[in-house]
Swiss-Prot record:
Protein name in the entry: Periviscerokinin-1
Presence of the UniProt keyword Transport in the record: no
Lineage: Eukaryota, Metazoa, Ecdysozoa, Arthropoda, Hexapoda
Source species of the chain: Pycnoscelus surinamensis
GO biological process, one term: neuropeptide signaling pathway
Free-text function comment from the UniProt entry: Mediates visceral muscle contractile activity (myotropic activity).
Record has Secreted as a keyword: yes
Protein family according to the UniProt entry: Belongs to the periviscerokinin family.
Amino acid sequence: GSPGLIPFGRS
């Protein structure tokens, strides 16, 4: 997902 900032899409 996002580049480490927010765990968006990092299930």
